[in-house]
């Protein structure tokens, strides 16, 4: 099977890391990048140097208006309107929509005008079907041309919830994600009309915020629809977040049994998506962690046989970007 030919729209945190992950995994080939706000030389600089994930180990050059990574040429465009991007000209059948702007199906479909055949939105979508690797990607059918990879938090929470629900049953649950700073936040207090707290300085505050990540689990696991909700605290760290899930179980169990269940899933059915650790870890230990979810056995607690708090770590940048690449590989296999 030929590897999928991919274009990336939006060369921000996720766009750049999707390119890195694609090169590492070698399951898809990035042939084009579109970003109207970054010129070619700056694009090369931003890809080469990364404050969180380190300097790119391969070669990065520019030549004849193209970005050359490890000797491979990538066509560069700078269009604001997705309908104007000539994806077919570069040979891109799949598009990673990582601007954070075109998350609605109708807007993402504009990529088809330029020749794209499939669009994978690297964000939650209100109307495009959402798929989480390890959880519901088996529900994907080839007639779906615009899909969402959900959010980084949903990618951590859903595998955890799936394992627990299948073994014990979840009656209801509340999630808090302690979430690293992202590009939408302000370095110092600034205007944020829709979210006043979100406009406060990221480096100086713990900021309560909303998240649809827990409710989105109900979209990828319909049997849990309406049983989970949650919120976020944005904290002054550059990467790695942690899910704190408090659930009421349908059947009685012990925390030792929960640990054994999570460990077994990490070694078998969820291998590569879910990991398990009993070590005394902190957030920086998970920078560049490829798994969607790392269950922290030592951090969870149990109040009684049906009520517990479970903790799982995730690199909200690198883990998520790897799942975008994995989802494209899965979609391509079924075409």
From Swiss-Prot:
Keywords: Cytoplasm, Glycolysis, NAD, Oxidoreductase. D-glyceraldehyde 3-phosphate binds at residues 151-153, 182, 211-212, 234. It is found in: Cytoplasm. CDD domains: GAPDH_I_C, GAPDH_I_N. It is an enzyme of class 1 (oxidoreductase). SUPFAM superfamilies: Glyceraldehyde-3-phosphate dehydrogenase-like, C-terminal domain, NAD(P)-binding Rossmann-fold domains. The active site is at residue 152. NAD(+) binds at residues 13-14, 35, 80, 316. GO terms for molecular function: glyceraldehyde-3-phosphate dehydrogenase (NAD+) (phosphorylating) activity; NAD binding; NADP binding. The record marks 179 as: Activates thiol group during catalysis. Its main location: cytoplasm. Its EC number is 1.2.1.12. The keyword Oxidoreductase applies. The keyword S-adenosyl-L-methionine does not apply. Pathway: Carbohydrate degradation; glycolysis; pyruvate from D-glyceraldehyde 3-phosphate: step 1/5. It catalyses: D-glyceraldehyde 3-phosphate + phosphate + NAD(+) = (2R)-3-phospho-glyceroyl phosphate + NADH + H(+). NCBIfam families: GAPDH-I. Homotetramer. Belongs to the glyceraldehyde-3-phosphate dehydrogenase family. This is Glyceraldehyde-3-phosphate dehydrogenase, cytosolic. It comes from Gracilaria gracilis (Red alga).
């Amino acid at each position: 099977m030929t590897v999928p030919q991919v274009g990336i729209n939006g060369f921000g945190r996720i766009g750049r890391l999707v390119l890195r992950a694609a090169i590492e995994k070698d399951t898809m080939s990035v042939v084009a990048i579109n970003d109207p706000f970054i010129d070619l030389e700056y694009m090369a600089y931003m890809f080469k140097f990364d404050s969180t994930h380190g300097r790119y180990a391969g070669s990065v050059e520019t030549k004849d208006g193209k970005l050359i990574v490890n000797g491979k040429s990538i066509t560069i465009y700078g269009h604001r309107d997705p309908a104007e991007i000539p994806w077919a000209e570069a040979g891109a059948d799949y598009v990673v929509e990582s601007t954070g702007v075109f998350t609605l199906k109708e807007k993402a479909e504009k990529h088809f005008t330029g020749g794209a055949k499939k669009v994978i939105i690297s964000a939650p979508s209100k109307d495009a079907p959402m798929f989480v690797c390890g959880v519901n990607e088996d529900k994907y059918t080839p007639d779906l041309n615009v899909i969402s990879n959900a959010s980084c938090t949903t990618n951590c929470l859903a595998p955890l919830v799936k394992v627990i629900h299948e073994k014990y049953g979840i009656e209801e649950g509340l999630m808090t994600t302690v979430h690293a700073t992202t590009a939408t936040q302000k370095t110092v207090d600034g205007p944020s009309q829709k979210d006043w707290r979100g406009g406060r300085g990221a480096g100086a505050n713990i900021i309560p915020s909303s998240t649809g990540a827990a409710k989105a689990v109900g979209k990828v696991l319909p049997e849990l629809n309406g049983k989970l909700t949650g919120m976020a605290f944005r904290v002054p760290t550059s990467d790695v977040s942690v899910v704190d899930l408090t659930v009421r179980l349908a059947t009685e169990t012990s925390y030792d049994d929960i640990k054994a269940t999570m460990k077994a899933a990490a070694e078998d059915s969820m291998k590569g998506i879910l990991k398990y650790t009993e070590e005394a870890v902190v957030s920086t230990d998970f920078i560049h962690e490829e798994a969607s979810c790392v269950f922290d056995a030592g951090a969870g607690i149990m109040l009684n046989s049906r009520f517990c708090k479970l903790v799982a770590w995730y690199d909200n940048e690198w883990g998520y970007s790897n799942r975008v690449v994995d989802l494209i590989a899965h979609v391509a296999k079924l075409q």
